[in-house]
Curated annotation (Swiss-Prot):
The gene is fmt. It catalyses: L-methionyl-tRNA(fMet) + (6R)-10-formyltetrahydrofolate = N-formyl-L-methionyl-tRNA(fMet) + (6S)-5,6,7,8-tetrahydrofolate + H(+). InterPro entries: Fmt, Formyl_trans_C, Formyl_transf_N, Formyl_transf_N_sf, Formyl_transferase-like_C_sf, GART_AS, Met-tRNA-FMT_C, Met-tRNA-FMT_N. It is an enzyme of class 2 (transferase). SUPFAM superfamilies: FMT C-terminal domain-like (SSF50486), Formyltransferase (SSF53328). Belongs to the Fmt family. It comes from Ruegeria sp. (strain TM1040). PROSITE patterns: GART (PS00373). This is Methionyl-tRNA formyltransferase. Attaches a formyl group to the free amino group of methionyl-tRNA(fMet). The formyl group appears to play a dual role in the initiator identity of N-formylmethionyl-tRNA by promoting its recognition by IF2 and preventing the misappropriation of this tRNA by the elongation apparatus.
Protein backbone atom coordinates (compact mmCIF):
# COMPACT_ATOMS: atom_id res chain seq x y z
CA UNK A 1 0.00 0.00 0.00
CA UNK A 2 1.00 3.62 -0.46
CA UNK A 3 1.30 4.89 3.11
CA UNK A 4 1.81 8.27 4.74
CA UNK A 5 3.52 7.78 8.09
CA UNK A 6 2.92 10.29 10.88
CA UNK A 7 4.86 9.99 14.14
CA UNK A 8 7.46 11.77 16.22
CA UNK A 9 9.06 10.07 19.28
CA UNK A 10 11.02 6.87 19.82
CA UNK A 11 7.76 4.95 20.33
CA UNK A 12 6.93 5.49 16.65
CA UNK A 13 10.23 4.30 15.16
CA UNK A 14 9.62 0.51 15.28
CA UNK A 15 6.30 1.09 13.51
CA UNK A 16 8.00 2.92 10.64
CA UNK A 17 10.60 0.15 10.41
CA UNK A 18 7.89 -2.52 10.33
CA UNK A 19 5.99 -0.78 7.51
CA UNK A 20 9.15 -0.50 5.42
CA UNK A 21 10.11 -4.12 6.12
CA UNK A 22 6.61 -5.28 5.13
CA UNK A 23 7.13 -3.72 1.70
CA UNK A 24 4.76 -0.78 1.93
CA UNK A 25 5.55 2.30 -0.13
CA UNK A 26 6.11 5.24 2.22
CA UNK A 27 4.87 8.30 0.34
CA UNK A 28 6.18 10.68 3.01
CA UNK A 29 6.98 10.82 6.71
CA UNK A 30 5.38 13.56 8.81
CA UNK A 31 6.84 14.43 12.22
CA UNK A 32 7.24 17.34 14.61
CA UNK A 33 9.83 19.97 13.64
CA UNK A 34 13.36 19.82 15.10
CA UNK A 35 13.52 21.45 18.53
CA UNK A 36 16.36 22.92 20.61
CA UNK A 37 17.92 20.26 22.83
CA UNK A 38 21.09 19.57 24.79
CA UNK A 39 23.46 22.02 26.41
CA UNK A 40 24.02 23.95 23.21
CA UNK A 41 20.27 24.22 22.59
CA UNK A 42 20.82 23.35 18.95
CA UNK A 43 17.89 22.14 16.88
CA UNK A 44 17.75 18.36 17.07
CA UNK A 45 15.63 16.23 14.73
CA UNK A 46 13.05 13.96 16.34
CA UNK A 47 13.70 10.19 16.49
CA UNK A 48 11.31 9.58 13.58
CA UNK A 49 12.93 12.34 11.52
CA UNK A 50 16.38 10.83 12.04
CA UNK A 51 15.22 7.30 11.24
CA UNK A 52 13.30 8.38 8.13
CA UNK A 53 16.33 10.20 6.74
CA UNK A 54 18.48 7.13 7.41
CA UNK A 55 15.96 5.11 5.39
CA UNK A 56 16.07 7.64 2.55
CA UNK A 57 12.45 8.70 2.98
CA UNK A 58 10.95 12.13 2.36
CA UNK A 59 10.44 13.98 5.65
CA UNK A 60 7.94 16.76 6.24
CA UNK A 61 7.62 18.62 9.54
CA UNK A 62 4.99 21.36 9.28
CA UNK A 63 4.22 23.37 12.40
CA UNK A 64 0.51 22.87 11.68
CA UNK A 65 -1.77 21.07 9.24
CA UNK A 66 -4.58 23.61 9.53
CA UNK A 67 -3.60 25.64 6.46
CA UNK A 68 -5.04 24.84 3.04
CA UNK A 69 -1.58 24.73 1.46
CA UNK A 70 -0.38 21.98 3.83
CA UNK A 71 -3.64 20.08 3.41
CA UNK A 72 -3.34 20.19 -0.38
CA UNK A 73 0.25 18.97 -0.18
CA UNK A 74 -0.91 16.09 2.03
CA UNK A 75 -3.75 15.14 -0.32
CA UNK A 76 -1.43 15.34 -3.34
CA UNK A 77 0.52 12.37 -1.97
CA UNK A 78 -2.41 10.23 -3.18
CA UNK A 79 -2.03 7.74 -0.33
CA UNK A 80 -4.04 4.61 0.33
CA UNK A 81 -3.82 5.16 4.09
CA UNK A 82 -2.07 7.23 6.75
CA UNK A 83 -0.62 5.49 9.80
CA UNK A 84 -0.48 7.78 12.83
CA UNK A 85 1.37 6.96 16.05
CA UNK A 86 2.25 9.61 18.65
CA UNK A 87 2.44 12.34 16.01
CA UNK A 88 1.55 15.23 18.29
CA UNK A 89 -0.51 17.47 16.00
CA UNK A 90 -4.27 17.66 15.59
CA UNK A 91 -5.39 16.34 12.21
CA UNK A 92 -8.13 18.46 10.58
CA UNK A 93 -11.01 16.69 8.86
CA UNK A 94 -9.53 17.43 5.43
CA UNK A 95 -6.41 15.47 6.41
CA UNK A 96 -8.39 12.62 7.96
CA UNK A 97 -10.40 12.27 4.75
CA UNK A 98 -7.55 12.55 2.24
CA UNK A 99 -6.18 8.95 2.13
CA UNK A 100 -8.48 6.44 0.46
CA UNK A 101 -8.76 4.32 3.63
CA UNK A 102 -8.49 7.28 5.99
CA UNK A 103 -6.08 7.59 8.91
CA UNK A 104 -5.33 4.70 11.28
CA UNK A 105 -4.02 5.48 14.76
CA UNK A 106 -1.99 3.17 16.98
CA UNK A 107 -3.00 3.95 20.57
CA UNK A 108 -1.29 2.45 23.62
CA UNK A 109 -4.30 1.56 25.75
CA UNK A 110 -7.44 -0.56 25.74
CA UNK A 111 -9.85 2.11 24.54
CA UNK A 112 -12.02 3.73 25.75
CA UNK A 113 -9.81 3.57 28.86
CA UNK A 114 -6.98 6.12 28.80
CA UNK A 115 -7.77 8.28 25.83
CA UNK A 116 -5.25 11.08 25.52
CA UNK A 117 -1.57 11.92 25.79
CA UNK A 118 -0.10 9.66 28.49
CA UNK A 119 -1.86 6.28 28.48
CA UNK A 120 1.19 4.21 29.49
CA UNK A 121 2.08 6.38 32.49
CA UNK A 122 -1.52 6.59 33.65
CA UNK A 123 -2.17 2.85 33.41
CA UNK A 124 0.78 2.04 35.68
CA UNK A 125 0.05 4.89 38.10
CA UNK A 126 -3.57 3.77 38.43
CA UNK A 127 -2.56 0.20 39.22
CA UNK A 128 -4.04 -1.33 36.07
CA UNK A 129 -3.08 -4.98 35.69
CA UNK A 130 -3.61 -5.03 31.91
CA UNK A 131 -3.23 -2.65 29.00
CA UNK A 132 -2.72 -3.07 25.28
CA UNK A 133 -2.79 -1.60 21.80
CA UNK A 134 -5.76 -0.48 19.75
CA UNK A 135 -5.68 0.21 16.01
CA UNK A 136 -8.33 2.87 15.56
CA UNK A 137 -9.97 4.56 12.58
CA UNK A 138 -9.37 8.22 13.36
CA UNK A 139 -12.13 10.80 13.57
CA UNK A 140 -12.28 14.38 14.82
CA UNK A 141 -12.71 13.50 18.53
CA UNK A 142 -9.81 12.70 20.89
CA UNK A 143 -9.20 8.96 20.48
CA UNK A 144 -12.91 8.34 19.98
CA UNK A 145 -12.85 6.47 16.66
CA UNK A 146 -14.00 2.89 16.10
CA UNK A 147 -11.46 0.16 16.86
CA UNK A 148 -10.33 -2.17 14.08
CA UNK A 149 -7.94 -4.33 16.07
CA UNK A 150 -7.04 -4.65 19.75
CA UNK A 151 -4.61 -6.77 21.72
CA UNK A 152 -4.24 -7.02 25.48
CA UNK A 153 -1.10 -7.56 27.55
CA UNK A 154 -0.41 -7.89 31.26
CA UNK A 155 1.45 -5.13 33.12
CA UNK A 156 4.25 -6.67 35.19
CA UNK A 157 4.27 -6.00 38.92
CA UNK A 158 7.66 -4.24 38.70
CA UNK A 159 7.32 -2.90 35.15
CA UNK A 160 8.21 0.73 34.49
CA UNK A 161 6.80 3.05 31.85
CA UNK A 162 10.10 2.68 29.96
CA UNK A 163 9.80 -1.11 29.75
CA UNK A 164 6.10 -1.12 28.95
CA UNK A 165 6.64 1.63 26.36
CA UNK A 166 9.12 -0.56 24.48
CA UNK A 167 6.89 -3.64 24.60
CA UNK A 168 3.82 -1.77 23.37
CA UNK A 169 5.79 -0.07 20.60
CA UNK A 170 6.82 -3.45 19.17
CA UNK A 171 3.30 -4.81 19.65
CA UNK A 172 1.86 -1.86 17.75
CA UNK A 173 4.36 -2.36 14.94
CA UNK A 174 3.31 -5.98 14.48
CA UNK A 175 -0.38 -5.16 14.72
CA UNK A 176 -0.41 -2.38 12.11
CA UNK A 177 1.26 -4.68 9.58
CA UNK A 178 -1.45 -7.27 10.27
CA UNK A 179 -4.16 -4.62 10.07
CA UNK A 180 -3.03 -3.32 6.68
CA UNK A 181 -2.78 -6.86 5.32
CA UNK A 182 -6.41 -7.59 6.25
CA UNK A 183 -7.87 -4.07 6.14
CA UNK A 184 -10.89 -4.82 3.88
CA UNK A 185 -11.95 -7.63 6.23
CA UNK A 186 -11.62 -5.77 9.52
CA UNK A 187 -14.79 -4.68 11.27
CA UNK A 188 -14.75 -1.25 12.91
CA UNK A 189 -16.19 -1.65 16.42
CA UNK A 190 -17.54 1.57 17.97
CA UNK A 191 -16.06 2.32 21.38
CA UNK A 192 -18.46 1.77 24.28
CA UNK A 193 -19.70 4.86 26.06
CA UNK A 194 -19.04 3.29 29.46
CA UNK A 195 -15.53 3.11 30.90
CA UNK A 196 -14.08 6.26 29.32
CA UNK A 197 -11.06 7.68 31.15
CA UNK A 198 -8.57 10.34 30.09
CA UNK A 199 -4.79 10.10 30.26
CA UNK A 200 -3.89 13.74 30.78
CA UNK A 201 -0.36 14.88 30.01
CA UNK A 202 2.06 14.31 32.88
CA UNK A 203 2.67 17.45 34.92
CA UNK A 204 6.11 17.62 36.55
CA UNK A 205 4.45 18.99 39.69
CA UNK A 206 2.76 15.63 40.32
CA UNK A 207 6.09 13.77 40.35
CA UNK A 208 7.00 14.59 43.97
CA UNK A 209 6.77 11.51 46.18
CA UNK A 210 4.32 11.66 49.07
CA UNK A 211 5.57 9.11 51.60
CA UNK A 212 2.34 9.38 53.64
CA UNK A 213 0.28 7.40 51.12
CA UNK A 214 0.24 3.61 50.80
CA UNK A 215 3.41 1.91 49.59
CA UNK A 216 1.53 0.54 46.58
CA UNK A 217 0.71 4.07 45.44
CA UNK A 218 4.30 5.27 45.94
CA UNK A 219 5.63 2.29 43.98
CA UNK A 220 3.17 2.87 41.13
CA UNK A 221 4.16 6.53 40.91
CA UNK A 222 7.86 5.66 40.78
CA UNK A 223 7.36 3.03 38.08
CA UNK A 224 4.82 5.09 36.15
CA UNK A 225 7.05 8.16 35.97
CA UNK A 226 10.24 6.29 35.06
CA UNK A 227 12.20 7.48 33.19
CA UNK A 228 10.37 10.77 32.61
CA UNK A 229 9.86 13.02 34.42
CA UNK A 230 11.02 10.81 37.29
CA UNK A 231 9.39 10.64 40.72
CA UNK A 232 11.49 12.58 43.22
CA UNK A 233 12.11 13.60 46.81
CA UNK A 234 14.54 16.08 48.37
CA UNK A 235 17.29 15.64 50.95
CA UNK A 236 19.16 18.69 52.27
CA UNK A 237 18.11 20.72 49.26
CA UNK A 238 19.15 18.09 46.71
CA UNK A 239 16.50 16.58 44.47
CA UNK A 240 16.82 12.84 44.00
CA UNK A 241 14.87 10.95 41.36
CA UNK A 242 13.81 7.36 41.92
CA UNK A 243 13.61 5.35 38.70
CA UNK A 244 12.96 1.84 40.01
CA UNK A 245 11.41 0.39 43.16
CA UNK A 246 9.55 -2.58 44.57
CA UNK A 247 7.26 -3.24 47.48
CA UNK A 248 9.00 -4.36 50.67
CA UNK A 249 8.24 -5.42 54.22
CA UNK A 250 8.83 -3.00 57.04
CA UNK A 251 7.15 -0.51 59.32
CA UNK A 252 8.21 2.75 60.89
CA UNK A 253 7.52 6.45 61.01
CA UNK A 254 6.41 7.74 57.60
CA UNK A 255 9.41 8.63 55.42
CA UNK A 256 11.98 6.78 57.53
CA UNK A 257 14.83 4.83 55.90
CA UNK A 258 14.49 1.42 57.55
CA UNK A 259 17.69 -0.34 56.46
CA UNK A 260 20.78 -0.18 54.26
CA UNK A 261 18.73 -1.34 51.25
CA UNK A 262 16.93 2.01 51.11
CA UNK A 263 13.63 0.59 52.28
CA UNK A 264 11.41 3.56 53.14
CA UNK A 265 8.33 3.45 55.36
CA UNK A 266 5.15 4.79 53.79
CA UNK A 267 1.67 5.56 55.13
CA UNK A 268 1.15 1.81 55.04
CA UNK A 269 3.83 -0.68 54.05
CA UNK A 270 7.22 0.20 52.61
CA UNK A 271 9.06 0.51 49.30
CA UNK A 272 12.61 -0.44 48.42
CA UNK A 273 14.38 2.11 46.21
CA UNK A 274 16.40 0.31 43.53
CA UNK A 275 17.67 2.98 41.14
CA UNK A 276 18.26 6.67 41.81
CA UNK A 277 19.58 9.77 40.07
CA UNK A 278 21.07 13.01 41.39
CA UNK A 279 20.61 16.25 39.47
CA UNK A 280 23.09 16.47 36.61
CA UNK A 281 24.28 12.88 37.13
CA UNK A 282 23.59 9.58 35.42
CA UNK A 283 21.10 7.19 36.98
CA UNK A 284 22.70 4.59 39.26
CA UNK A 285 21.70 1.31 40.84
CA UNK A 286 21.21 1.62 44.59
CA UNK A 287 24.54 0.07 45.61
CA UNK A 288 26.55 2.41 43.38
CA UNK A 289 24.46 5.43 44.38
CA UNK A 290 25.08 4.83 48.10
CA UNK A 291 28.85 4.89 47.60
CA UNK A 292 28.59 8.57 46.76
CA UNK A 293 25.54 9.67 48.74
CA UNK A 294 24.61 8.90 52.34
CA UNK A 295 21.06 7.94 53.24
CA UNK A 296 21.67 6.13 56.49
CA UNK A 297 19.26 3.88 58.34
CA UNK A 298 17.04 6.03 60.55
CA UNK A 299 17.10 9.07 58.25
CA UNK A 300 13.64 10.57 57.96
CA UNK A 301 13.09 11.88 54.44
CA UNK A 302 10.30 14.21 55.54
CA UNK A 303 12.56 15.87 58.11
CA UNK A 304 15.51 15.91 55.70
CA UNK A 305 13.35 17.63 53.10
CA UNK A 306 12.06 20.24 55.56
CA UNK A 307 15.62 20.90 56.78
CA UNK A 308 16.64 22.60 53.58
Amino acid sequence: MRVIFMGTPEFSVPVLDALVEAGHEIAAVYCQPPRPAGRGKKDRPTPVHARAEALGLEVRHPVSLKGSEEQQAFAALNADVAVVVAYGLILPQAVLDAPRAGCLNIHASLLPRWRGAAPIHRAIMAGDTHTGICIMQMEAGLDTGPVLLRKETEIGGEETTAALHDRLSLMGARMIVDALATLPDLKAEPQPEAGVTYASKIDKAEAQIDWSVAAEEVDRKIRGLSPFPGAWFEVDGQRLKVLASRLAEGTGAVGTVLDDKLTVACGSGAVELLRLQRAGKAAQDREVFLRGFTLAKGTNLLTAQDAE
